[in-house]
């Protein structure tokens, strides 16, 4: 014989948990339906965070600017070392560096000693030699101060690149937070 009993009641899970994301955004994919049974660690949903995406885009733009700046300063350093202007006067990105190098070269030419005028004026060879040595010393001081200034700019630009890259890496490391998993 079979006995059938009908009773009214509600079945509840022994563990009920509410899940929230640490980022705001819109749910792009749901891997389960509401009320489904899940196991610990199951993937529940994917969230697209517009705030983080905008922050990442902004950081990538900054990184590009700082990297270009770093490249330009390295090129300027090479210009001074090679005594050649590798920048284009017509390229808007090159112009500040082109003119920076040209200013340096103008200062060098102002400090360069021309003995012919002094010889014609009757200066002695000893006086001319002293003036030439002083002029050479000033040109060397200008060279080293320019190299030091450019090197400091390179260090600063590299620091900016490293800082923004670290922020991007930290942002990308948190990419797992875009996914919601069942609590463990």
PLM feature spans:
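Long, charged alpha-helical "stalk" segments
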Residues: 28-179, 183
